[in-house]
Regions:
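N-terminal Rossmann-fold NAD(P) dinucleotide-binding loop
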Residues: 45
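Conserved G/P- and acidic residue-centered "switch" motifs that form tight phosphate/ATP-binding loops
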Residues: 40
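His/Asp/Glu-rich metal-coordinating catalytic cores
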Residues: 1-37, 53-212
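A short acidic, amphipathic alpha-helical/loop segment
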Residues: 48-52
Length: 212
């Protein structure tokens, strides 16, 4: 079969609902991607890698060592932000639902002190109690928000990285190689020269990140 090489896998950044919808959908099947080449660590170029690997991508992620090292911090941090954001949105949903319950006939069975106790149960000190929030959302069949990926997903994605020096030809497919050259964008960023044979002819194509 034909090899498919993915150049970057970035996160769309914009308004929450629009970004969430775009980021969850790939215009390709991750299982069909042979390998991926990452130009640099910025989230708009690397941010969906944990989603890619969670959806059964089975190849390797090629980058410079500096880019791989940066992703070891940026991807878990991205996951933490998404998990925190989802928890806060679910907390707001739960609080709103409790407000509606308070106005309903069912509220007559719950004292004000009891209702305040339920609200307080959604937090542990100054932190949100995600288990209590999720349980309330499930109990009342509310629409919750899931993070795009978790910190566990991000840590797992880091095991897919293979780092290489600049100007070193790397085999990324059958008859396909890539070479990383200094891009001068951020530390570790690279322009990728992909070399392959097409209809018996050798071709070379430069790229500084493509898929976002």
């Amino acid at each position: 079969g034909q090899d498919r090489i993915l150049l970057d896998c970035g996160m769309f950044q914009g308004r929450r609902n629009e970004a969430a919808e775009k980021n969850r959908v790939f215009p390709f099947d991750p299982r069909l991607v042979t390998n991926m080449v990452l130009s640099h660590a910025h989230i708009d170029h690397s941010g969906r890698i944990p989603l890619l690997t969670r959806r059964d991508f089975a190849g390797r992620i090629i980058s410079t060592r500096a880019t791989a090292d940066a992703c070891a911090y940026l991807l878990p941090d991205s996951a933490y932000i998404q998990q925190s954001d989802a928890a806060y949105l679910n907390y707001k949903t739960a609080r709103t639902a409790l407000g509606e319950i308070r106005k309903s006939k069912k509220a007559k069975k719950i004292s004000n002190r009891g209702m305040e106790g339920i609200k307080k149960s959604l937090k542990k000190g100054h932190k949100l109690d995600t288990e209590a929030i999720d349980a309330l959302i499930d109990r009342h069949h509310l629409k919750g928000v899931d993070p795009l990926y978790t910190m566990e997903d991000a840590r797992e994605a880091l095991t897919y990285f293979d780092d290489y020096p600049y100007r070193h030809p790397i085999t990324v497919g059958n008859g396909v190689t890539c070479t990383l050259y200094e891009a001068g964008h951020i530390l570790g960023s690279a322009i990728t020269i992909v070399r392959a044979k097409e209809k018996g002819r050798a071709i070379s194509r430069p790229a500084l990140g493509v898929f976002t």
